[in-house]
Amino acid sequence: MVLCCVFLLFLTGSFAQDVGTIVTSDLFNEMLKNRNDDRCPAKGFYTYDAFIAAANSFPGFGTTGDDTARKKEIAAFFGQTSHETTGGSLSADGPFAGGYCFVREGNQMGSGFYGRGPIQLTGQSNYDLAGQAIGQDLVNNPDLVATDATVSFKTAIWFWMTAQGNKPSCHDVITGQWTPSAADASANRQPGYGVITNIINGGIECGKGQNPQVEDRIGFYRRYCTILNVAPGDNLDCYDQRNFAEA
């Protein structure tokens, strides 16, 4: 019985390895190769050790399923967050090697609840909920997301792992654990990377036809899938999806 349970855990990914077995230091540096460019305000901030420490605080992140599923989640996470923090074309490697250039939205300063960190955490409610989840008072100290790299990554992974309202978690979508409801099907929200864009910024980017923001998110994702040697899957855009606020 014990051996049977262990075998089942192995198959389902619940007995998964450390995220660092997929994202090595060399891979991290290859994916985010221009993050420490002199033109990047975030130079020196986003470190491999901070990412691993944060990732290991969230069971299931990058450890769910087989190696293909795990790599696909890592590619999707860094694809979305690289768009949120992009510095554009910083080298001959092109625009999809320019992620993690910024920490603060518009390089702002001060204590407001503007976008910070890899996911550009925004709004007092998100700062409050994220802070409760990771054990930090981010309402009274929101700039901790821009000054402590581990906290910064933790807020991004918290957002990634957490369902809110009628939105599934990004994690459940990319790992195949989300089943669209009738309302989702009616809104053309099908499993794939495009729904994750809808979760993150659907009100601005989705259901409006082809646009450069969604193209940029897909471009980052495709680059990381290539580096990780994994297929990106179907339904990459949200051009024809209604956003979740429209139900």
UniProtKB/Swiss-Prot annotation:
Induction: By fungal infection. It catalyses: Random endo-hydrolysis of N-acetyl-beta-D-glucosaminide (1->4)-beta-linkages in chitin and chitodextrins. Its EC number is 3.2.1.14. It holds the Pfam family Glyco_hydro_19. Keywords: Carbohydrate metabolism, Chitin degradation, Disulfide bond, Glycosidase, Hydrolase, Pathogenesis-related protein, Plant defense, Polysaccharide degradation, Secreted, Signal. GO terms for molecular function: chitinase activity; endochitinase activity. The gene is CHI17. InterPro entries: Glyco_hydro_19 (IPR016283), Glyco_hydro_19_cat (IPR000726), Lysozyme-like_dom_sf (IPR023346). It is found in: Secreted, Extracellular space. This is Acidic 27 kDa endochitinase. PROSITE patterns: CHITINASE_19_1, CHITINASE_19_2. The keyword Iron does not apply. The keyword DNA-binding does not apply.
